[in-house]
Amino acid sequence: MAYQDEESKEYSEKVVKIDRVAKVVKGGRRFSFNALSVVGDQKGKVGIGFGKANEVPDAIRKSIEAAKKHLVKINFKGHTIPHEVVGKFKSARVILKPSTAGTGIIAGASVRSIVEKAGIQDVLTKSWGSSNPVNIVKATLDALEQLETPILAAKKRGISLNQLFGKD
C-alpha cells in the first residue's frame, strides 16, 4: 500500500471531462459515465486516460489509472517548448508556439490541462477543427510528442549544432 501512496504523490491529476451517456434498452435508458483525465509530474512526463463506469467516481479512478499506464516523456528544457509544433487527431488541430518567460499558458481549458501537467510554464496555443475535449487533448499530446531538443534535431540530421542554427 505504501508504494501506491508514493506514486499518487508523484503525479498530479486533472479531470478534463465527465460525460453521462445512455444505452436505450427495453425497459428505458441505462445511464453510465465516462471520464477523461490528465496525469503529469510537471517535469516532462504526462499521460491521458479514458475511463468508463456506472458511477462517476469509478469512471474517474479508471481514467486516472489508465493515464498513469500511458505516460509519455516530453522533450523540453526550461520554461517553454523548443520550437513551434502542430498536433493532429481526427479533425482536431492544435498549434503550440514557444513564448518568452512570464507569458504564461495562453490556451483553452483542454490544452491548458495537459500543458500544465507536462510542466511547461510559457506557451501560446491555438486549437481549431473539432472542439471535442477528447480530440483536443489527444491532438495536444500528439504535438508534445513531436517536440525535440536542438541536440536531438542535429543528431537526427547528422549535422552539428552550429550548422543547425546557421552559424557555420
Curated annotation (Swiss-Prot):
Keywords on record: Ribonucleoprotein, Ribosomal protein, RNA-binding, rRNA-binding
Source species, domain of life: Bacteria
GO BP annotations, alphabetical order: translation
InterPro entries: Ribosomal_Su5_D2-typ_SF, Ribosomal_uS5, Ribosomal_uS5_bac-type, Ribosomal_uS5_C, Ribosomal_uS5_N, Ribosomal_uS5_N_CS, Ribsml_uS5_D2-typ_fold_subgr
GO cellular component: small ribosomal subunit
Pfam families the record matches: Ribosomal_S5 (PF00333), Ribosomal_S5_C (PF03719)
Domain S5 DRBM: 11-74
Molecular-function GO term, any one: structural constituent of ribosome
Subunit structure: Part of the 30S ribosomal subunit. Contacts proteins S4 and S8.
This protein's domain notes: The N-terminal domain interacts with the head of the 30S subunit; the C-terminal domain interacts with the body and contacts protein S4. The interaction surface between S4 and S5 is involved in control of translational fidelity.
Similarity annotation: Belongs to the universal ribosomal protein uS5 family.
Function: With S4 and S12 plays an important role in translational accuracy. Located at the back of the 30S subunit body where it stabilizes the conformation of the head with respect to the body.
Protein name in UniProt: Small ribosomal subunit protein uS5
Source species: Leptospira borgpetersenii serovar Hardjo-bovis (strain JB197)
